[in-house]
């Protein structure tokens, strides 16, 4: 089987982290985000994976090629000279995706969930139509494009309603698909949208079904959702692989994932919902909750860190406090006793005065 991951462009929503690394290589759960998807595809029997890239492809190649042998897959990089949207990349990768008659998976690189690839493939084969969209239920469907089903045929999609004013359903496109190779014939080689241009054709032909996703789902393309997605991921990990979570005495409230190379002072209080990466140092009496500490960062004595992404090589000083979805880029220093609330701090900056409201520090 085959799979295509829509890696996309600059990752502007996740800046300042993406000023240092392309978004799919930013660590989520202490592994590059895209590695969760590659692993899930490989586990479902996918042998050929295409990464549709238009930003810093050389970094992606050098980082991800080494995983081919580990996961037993062939990784091909389809490099767009101009951004081709969400459908154009399928046309660009036509040679790989149409090399046999088997269907192929398509997924957005921002999506984190319990990837149901095996079940999705079985469902797709059973109904026999050209395409299947994974659908997830949401609490506020008025913010999304909602899937409306045919009244007579279960799971057959009748139409999409964009940001409905009145309730028509609560299932939305989860950014995961399985498609027959024939779908590529509907796509032109130009910037084009699979959601707005290709799927409506399949709906009109009664060739598009939806498959309900069980469990958690999150598009982690921006900081607040990256943190929320981390909470969901850690909760899932606690149920499926509790042995991977930290059980030390300094863990408070559970759902804490710590790289074995990190050094945590015994008097620190960590959790709930914290990920700590390689070579991180957490000092005496520090308090960390609902946060992500990326590799080589430091939280010094008695600092208080909440709802914060601490970038690589960054340092939070003694008695400092960060909260309010603060994101520190690479090599940022927050000085001792400084308060930071909701700031996005670009790489290599030093914060020596309080930041009391949401702002970008350049």
Curated annotation (Swiss-Prot):
Keyword vocabulary terms for this entry: Cell cycle, Cytoplasm, GTP-binding, Nucleotide-binding, Nucleotidyltransferase, Transferase
Classification via Gene3D superfamilies: Hexapeptide repeat proteins, Spore Coat Polysaccharide Biosynthesis Protein SpsA, Chain A
Gene Ontology BP annotations: cell wall mannoprotein biosynthetic process; GDP-mannose biosynthetic process; protein glycosylation
Top EC category: transferase
Pathway(s) of this molecule: Nucleotide-sugar biosynthesis; GDP-alpha-D-mannose biosynthesis; GDP-alpha-D-mannose from alpha-D-mannose 1-phosphate (GTP route): step 1/1
Domain of life where this protein originates: Eukaryota
Cellular component GO terms held in the UniProt record: cell surface; cytoplasm; plasma membrane; yeast-form cell wall
Location, primary (coarse class): cytoplasm
Alphabetical list of SUPFAM superfamilies matching this protein: Nucleotide-diphospho-sugar transferases
EC id: 2.7.7.13
Entry's family note: Belongs to the transferase hexapeptide repeat family.
Name of the protein described by the UniProt record: Mannose-1-phosphate guanyltransferase
The organism of origin for this protein: Candida albicans (strain SC5314 / ATCC MYA-2876)
Classification lineage: Eukaryota, Fungi, Dikarya, Ascomycota, Saccharomycotina
């Amino acid at each position: 089987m085959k799979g295509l991951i829509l890696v996309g462009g600059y990752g502007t929503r996740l800046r300042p982290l993406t000023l240092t690394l392309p978004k799919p290589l930013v660590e989520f759960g202490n592994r590059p985000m895209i590695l969760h998807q590659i692993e899930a595809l490989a586990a479902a029997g996918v042998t050929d994976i295409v990464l549709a890239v238009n930003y810093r492809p050389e970094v992606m190649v050098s980082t991800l090629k080494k995983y081919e042998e580990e996961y037993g897959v062939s990784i091909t990089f389809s490099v767009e000279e101009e951004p081709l949207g969400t459908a154009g990349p399928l046309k660009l990768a036509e040679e790989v995706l149409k090399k046999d008659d088997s269907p192929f998976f398509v997924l957005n690189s921002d999506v984190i969930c319990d990837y149901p690839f095996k079940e999705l493939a079985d469902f797709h084969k059973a109904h026999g139509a050209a395409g299947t969209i994974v659908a997830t239920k949401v609490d506020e469907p008025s913010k999304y494009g909602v899937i409306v089903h045919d009244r007579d045929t279960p799971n057959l999609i009748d139409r999409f309603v964009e940001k409905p004013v009145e309730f028509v359903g609560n299932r939305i496109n989860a950014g995961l698909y399985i498609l027959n190779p024939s779908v590529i014939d509907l796509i032109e080689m130009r910037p084009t949208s699979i959601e707005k241009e290709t799927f409506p054709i399949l709906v009109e032909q009664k060739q598009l079904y939806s498959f309900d996703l069980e469990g958690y789902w999150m598009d982690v393309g921006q900081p607040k959702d990256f943190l929320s997605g981390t909470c969901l991921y850690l909760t899932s990990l606690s149920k499926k692989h509790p042995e991977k979570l930290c059980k030390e005495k300094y863990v408070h409230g559970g759902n804490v994932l710590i790289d074995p190379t990190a050094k945590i002072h015994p008097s620190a209080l960590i959790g709930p919902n914290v990920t700590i990466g390689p070579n991180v140092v957490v000092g005496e009496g520090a308090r960390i909750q609902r946060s992500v500490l990326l590799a080589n960062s430091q939280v010094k004595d008695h600092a208080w860190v909440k709802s914060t992404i601490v970038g690589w090589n960054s340092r939070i000083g003694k008695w400092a406090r960060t909260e309010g979805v603060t994101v520190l880029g690479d090599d940022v220093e927050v000085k001792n006793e400084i308060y930071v609330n909701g700031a996005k701090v670009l790489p290599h900056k030093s914060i020596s005065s309080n930041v009391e409201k949401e702002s970008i520090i350049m």
